[in-house]
Curated annotation (Swiss-Prot):
Gene Ontology MF term list: GTP binding; GTPase activity
Species annotation: Candida glabrata (strain ATCC 2001 / BCRC 20586 / JCM 3761 / NBRC 0622 / NRRL Y-65 / CBS 138) (Yeast)
Motif Gly-Pro-Asn (GPN)-loop positions after renumbering to this chain: 70-72
Protein name: GPN-loop GTPase 3
Subunit relationships: Heterodimers with GPN1 or GPN2. Binds to RNA polymerase II (RNAPII).
DNA repair as UniProt keyword: no
Length: 271
Protein backbone atom coordinates (compact mmCIF):
# COMPACT_ATOMS: atom_id res chain seq x y z
CA UNK A 1 0.00 0.00 0.00
CA UNK A 2 1.27 3.44 -0.93
CA UNK A 3 2.48 6.12 1.40
CA UNK A 4 0.01 8.87 0.61
CA UNK A 5 -0.11 12.52 1.58
CA UNK A 6 -2.84 15.09 0.98
CA UNK A 7 -1.92 18.78 1.12
CA UNK A 8 -4.86 21.00 2.05
CA UNK A 9 -4.29 24.51 0.73
CA UNK A 10 -6.32 27.68 0.35
CA UNK A 11 -6.67 31.19 1.75
CA UNK A 12 -7.46 31.85 5.39
CA UNK A 13 -11.10 31.20 6.17
CA UNK A 14 -11.65 28.80 3.27
CA UNK A 15 -12.48 25.93 5.63
CA UNK A 16 -9.23 23.94 5.42
CA UNK A 17 -9.26 22.68 9.01
CA UNK A 18 -12.96 21.80 8.78
CA UNK A 19 -12.23 19.87 5.59
CA UNK A 20 -9.37 18.00 7.30
CA UNK A 21 -11.67 17.07 10.17
CA UNK A 22 -14.36 15.90 7.73
CA UNK A 23 -11.88 13.68 5.87
CA UNK A 24 -10.65 12.17 9.14
CA UNK A 25 -14.21 11.55 10.33
CA UNK A 26 -15.20 9.93 7.03
CA UNK A 27 -12.13 7.69 6.99
CA UNK A 28 -12.84 6.54 10.53
CA UNK A 29 -16.38 5.68 9.46
CA UNK A 30 -15.22 3.50 6.56
CA UNK A 31 -12.40 1.88 8.52
CA UNK A 32 -9.38 3.68 7.05
CA UNK A 33 -6.66 5.22 9.14
CA UNK A 34 -5.49 8.79 8.64
CA UNK A 35 -3.62 11.42 10.59
CA UNK A 36 -3.51 15.22 10.47
CA UNK A 37 -0.11 16.86 10.16
CA UNK A 38 -0.40 20.48 11.22
CA UNK A 39 1.97 22.72 9.28
CA UNK A 40 0.42 25.96 10.53
CA UNK A 41 2.41 27.38 13.46
CA UNK A 42 -0.56 29.65 14.26
CA UNK A 43 -3.23 26.94 14.17
CA UNK A 44 -6.30 27.07 16.37
CA UNK A 45 -7.41 24.03 18.40
CA UNK A 46 -8.88 21.26 16.24
CA UNK A 47 -11.68 18.78 16.83
CA UNK A 48 -9.18 16.00 16.15
CA UNK A 49 -5.75 15.91 17.71
CA UNK A 50 -2.81 16.56 15.44
CA UNK A 51 -0.64 13.48 15.14
CA UNK A 52 2.25 15.72 14.09
CA UNK A 53 2.27 19.41 14.99
CA UNK A 54 4.81 21.99 13.85
CA UNK A 55 4.08 23.91 17.07
CA UNK A 56 5.97 21.18 18.93
CA UNK A 57 9.02 22.41 17.02
CA UNK A 58 8.28 26.13 16.77
CA UNK A 59 5.23 28.34 17.27
CA UNK A 60 4.22 31.65 15.75
CA UNK A 61 3.51 33.32 19.09
CA UNK A 62 6.94 32.45 20.48
CA UNK A 63 8.70 33.81 17.39
CA UNK A 64 6.68 37.04 17.41
CA UNK A 65 7.42 37.60 21.08
CA UNK A 66 11.11 36.68 21.09
CA UNK A 67 12.13 38.22 17.75
CA UNK A 68 9.64 41.10 17.67
CA UNK A 69 8.34 40.11 14.24
CA UNK A 70 4.93 40.64 12.69
CA UNK A 71 2.67 37.70 11.82
CA UNK A 72 3.87 37.25 8.23
CA UNK A 73 7.54 37.66 9.07
CA UNK A 74 7.20 35.24 11.97
CA UNK A 75 5.45 32.70 9.75
CA UNK A 76 8.26 32.81 7.20
CA UNK A 77 10.81 32.46 10.00
CA UNK A 78 8.95 29.38 11.31
CA UNK A 79 9.10 27.67 7.94
CA UNK A 80 12.72 28.57 7.35
CA UNK A 81 13.42 27.02 10.75
CA UNK A 82 11.48 23.91 9.73
CA UNK A 83 13.53 23.65 6.53
CA UNK A 84 16.70 23.63 8.64
CA UNK A 85 15.24 20.90 10.85
CA UNK A 86 13.66 18.50 8.39
CA UNK A 87 15.12 15.62 10.38
CA UNK A 88 12.50 16.49 13.03
CA UNK A 89 9.74 16.10 10.44
CA UNK A 90 11.25 12.83 9.18
CA UNK A 91 11.37 11.42 12.69
CA UNK A 92 7.81 12.51 13.46
CA UNK A 93 6.43 10.97 10.26
CA UNK A 94 8.28 7.76 11.06
CA UNK A 95 6.72 4.62 9.66
CA UNK A 96 3.27 5.79 8.58
CA UNK A 97 3.51 3.65 5.47
CA UNK A 98 -0.06 2.39 5.11
CA UNK A 99 -2.02 5.42 6.25
CA UNK A 100 -3.07 8.80 4.92
CA UNK A 101 -1.26 11.84 6.19
CA UNK A 102 -3.29 15.01 5.74
CA UNK A 103 -1.12 18.12 5.77
CA UNK A 104 -3.09 21.14 7.00
CA UNK A 105 -1.19 24.10 5.52
CA UNK A 106 -1.26 27.83 6.32
CA UNK A 107 -3.30 30.12 4.11
CA UNK A 108 -0.56 32.62 3.26
CA UNK A 109 0.09 32.37 -0.47
CA UNK A 110 3.57 33.85 -0.14
CA UNK A 111 4.81 30.52 1.24
CA UNK A 112 4.83 29.17 -2.29
CA UNK A 113 4.84 32.30 -4.46
CA UNK A 114 7.45 34.57 -2.85
CA UNK A 115 9.66 32.03 -1.11
CA UNK A 116 10.02 28.35 -2.11
CA UNK A 117 9.15 26.92 1.30
CA UNK A 118 6.20 24.67 0.50
CA UNK A 119 7.68 23.56 -2.86
CA UNK A 120 10.85 22.50 -1.01
CA UNK A 121 8.83 20.59 1.59
CA UNK A 122 6.91 18.88 -1.22
CA UNK A 123 10.13 17.81 -2.92
CA UNK A 124 11.46 16.48 0.39
CA UNK A 125 8.30 14.45 1.02
CA UNK A 126 8.40 13.03 -2.49
CA UNK A 127 12.12 12.43 -2.78
CA UNK A 128 13.32 11.53 0.70
CA UNK A 129 10.15 10.03 2.16
CA UNK A 130 8.63 8.53 -0.99
CA UNK A 131 5.17 10.05 -0.71
CA UNK A 132 2.51 10.07 -3.39
CA UNK A 133 1.07 13.54 -2.91
CA UNK A 134 -2.06 15.32 -4.01
CA UNK A 135 -2.94 18.97 -3.39
CA UNK A 136 -6.45 20.20 -2.75
CA UNK A 137 -7.02 23.94 -3.03
CA UNK A 138 -10.11 25.25 -1.27
CA UNK A 139 -12.00 28.39 -2.26
CA UNK A 140 -15.11 29.35 -0.31
CA UNK A 141 -18.26 29.50 -2.42
CA UNK A 142 -19.68 32.69 -0.82
CA UNK A 143 -16.54 34.53 -1.98
CA UNK A 144 -16.13 33.28 -5.55
CA UNK A 145 -19.81 33.40 -6.54
CA UNK A 146 -18.96 36.91 -7.75
CA UNK A 147 -17.38 36.62 -11.23
CA UNK A 148 -14.43 38.95 -10.59
CA UNK A 149 -13.65 37.28 -7.27
CA UNK A 150 -13.85 33.90 -8.96
CA UNK A 151 -10.95 34.85 -11.23
CA UNK A 152 -8.94 36.09 -8.26
CA UNK A 153 -9.42 32.75 -6.53
CA UNK A 154 -8.74 30.77 -9.69
CA UNK A 155 -5.42 32.58 -10.20
CA UNK A 156 -4.31 31.83 -6.63
CA UNK A 157 -5.24 28.17 -7.13
CA UNK A 158 -3.32 28.15 -10.40
CA UNK A 159 -0.25 29.57 -8.66
CA UNK A 160 -0.30 26.66 -6.23
CA UNK A 161 -0.77 24.16 -9.05
CA UNK A 162 2.15 25.49 -11.10
CA UNK A 163 4.63 26.06 -8.27
CA UNK A 164 3.97 22.84 -6.33
CA UNK A 165 3.84 20.64 -9.46
CA UNK A 166 1.42 18.19 -7.85
CA UNK A 167 -1.80 16.50 -8.92
CA UNK A 168 -4.28 19.20 -8.09
CA UNK A 169 -7.95 19.17 -7.10
CA UNK A 170 -9.91 22.40 -6.74
CA UNK A 171 -12.67 22.44 -4.14
CA UNK A 172 -15.50 24.94 -3.73
CA UNK A 173 -16.13 24.84 0.01
CA UNK A 174 -19.01 26.06 2.19
CA UNK A 175 -21.51 25.37 -0.56
CA UNK A 176 -24.18 24.76 2.05
CA UNK A 177 -24.04 28.47 2.95
CA UNK A 178 -25.28 29.64 -0.45
CA UNK A 179 -27.04 26.78 -2.24
CA UNK A 180 -30.45 27.87 -0.94
CA UNK A 181 -29.84 31.49 -1.94
CA UNK A 182 -28.56 30.85 -5.47
CA UNK A 183 -30.22 28.65 -8.06
CA UNK A 184 -28.69 25.34 -9.10
CA UNK A 185 -28.09 26.69 -12.59
CA UNK A 186 -25.93 29.55 -11.30
CA UNK A 187 -23.96 27.30 -8.96
CA UNK A 188 -23.22 24.86 -11.78
CA UNK A 189 -21.69 27.73 -13.76
CA UNK A 190 -18.98 28.05 -11.10
CA UNK A 191 -18.37 24.32 -10.68
CA UNK A 192 -17.84 23.84 -14.42
CA UNK A 193 -17.28 27.42 -15.53
CA UNK A 194 -17.09 28.94 -18.96
CA UNK A 195 -14.20 31.32 -18.27
CA UNK A 196 -14.99 33.62 -21.19
CA UNK A 197 -18.65 33.93 -20.18
CA UNK A 198 -17.68 34.80 -16.61
CA UNK A 199 -15.18 37.34 -17.93
CA UNK A 200 -17.92 39.02 -19.94
CA UNK A 201 -20.05 39.23 -16.80
CA UNK A 202 -17.18 40.77 -14.86
CA UNK A 203 -16.68 43.34 -17.64
CA UNK A 204 -20.15 44.76 -17.02
CA UNK A 205 -19.07 46.21 -13.67
CA UNK A 206 -15.58 47.38 -14.64
CA UNK A 207 -13.99 50.28 -16.43
CA UNK A 208 -13.66 49.34 -20.12
CA UNK A 209 -9.88 49.67 -19.93
CA UNK A 210 -9.84 46.46 -17.85
CA UNK A 211 -11.86 44.41 -20.35
CA UNK A 212 -8.81 43.23 -22.27
CA UNK A 213 -7.12 42.22 -19.01
CA UNK A 214 -10.18 40.17 -18.06
CA UNK A 215 -10.14 38.39 -21.40
CA UNK A 216 -6.45 37.56 -21.01
CA UNK A 217 -7.02 36.17 -17.52
CA UNK A 218 -9.95 34.10 -18.79
CA UNK A 219 -7.80 32.69 -21.58
CA UNK A 220 -5.08 31.83 -19.06
CA UNK A 221 -7.56 30.02 -16.81
CA UNK A 222 -8.87 28.07 -19.80
CA UNK A 223 -5.39 27.20 -21.07
CA UNK A 224 -4.38 25.66 -17.74
CA UNK A 225 -7.55 23.65 -17.44
CA UNK A 226 -8.86 25.45 -14.37
CA UNK A 227 -12.36 24.60 -15.50
CA UNK A 228 -13.82 22.45 -12.74
CA UNK A 229 -14.32 22.66 -9.00
CA UNK A 230 -15.63 19.89 -6.80
CA UNK A 231 -18.42 21.03 -4.46
CA UNK A 232 -17.91 20.52 -0.74
CA UNK A 233 -20.38 20.44 2.09
CA UNK A 234 -18.21 19.44 5.02
CA UNK A 235 -21.15 17.93 6.92
CA UNK A 236 -22.36 15.90 3.93
CA UNK A 237 -20.69 12.44 3.90
CA UNK A 238 -21.43 11.92 0.19
CA UNK A 239 -19.76 15.22 -0.70
CA UNK A 240 -16.66 14.32 1.31
CA UNK A 241 -16.61 10.78 -0.13
CA UNK A 242 -16.70 12.13 -3.70
CA UNK A 243 -13.69 14.36 -3.12
CA UNK A 244 -11.83 11.51 -1.42
CA UNK A 245 -12.51 9.29 -4.46
CA UNK A 246 -10.73 11.84 -6.65
CA UNK A 247 -7.79 11.98 -4.24
CA UNK A 248 -7.59 8.17 -4.20
CA UNK A 249 -7.60 8.12 -7.98
CA UNK A 250 -4.76 10.60 -8.51
CA UNK A 251 -2.59 9.19 -5.71
CA UNK A 252 -3.27 5.57 -6.77
CA UNK A 253 -4.04 4.59 -3.20
CA UNK A 254 -4.19 0.84 -2.62
CA UNK A 255 -3.46 -0.18 -6.19
CA UNK A 256 -3.97 -3.80 -5.23
CA UNK A 257 -7.60 -3.10 -4.39
CA UNK A 258 -10.38 -2.88 -6.95
CA UNK A 259 -10.31 0.63 -8.35
CA UNK A 260 -13.37 2.86 -8.09
CA UNK A 261 -13.45 5.56 -10.73
CA UNK A 262 -14.51 9.02 -9.54
CA UNK A 263 -17.63 10.56 -10.97
CA UNK A 264 -17.28 12.05 -14.44
CA UNK A 265 -19.60 14.92 -13.61
CA UNK A 266 -20.32 16.74 -10.39
CA UNK A 267 -24.06 17.32 -10.08
CA UNK A 268 -25.21 20.05 -7.74
CA UNK A 269 -28.51 18.18 -7.40
CA UNK A 270 -26.69 15.37 -5.58
CA UNK A 271 -25.85 17.66 -2.68
Amino acid sequence: MSRVGLLVLGPAGAGKSTFCNSIISHMQTIGRRAHIVNLDPAAEPSKYEFTIDIRDLISLDDVMEELDLGPNGALIYCFEYLMKNLDWLDEEIGDYNDEYLIFDCPGQIELYTHIPVLPNIVRHLQGQLNFNLCATYLLEAPFVIDSSKFFSGALSAMSAMILLELPHINVLSKLDMIKDEYGKKKLKRFLNPDAMLLANEADQNLNPKFHHLNQCIANLVDDFGMVQFLPLEANNPESVATILSYVDDVTQWAEAQEQKEPKDQIDIEDL
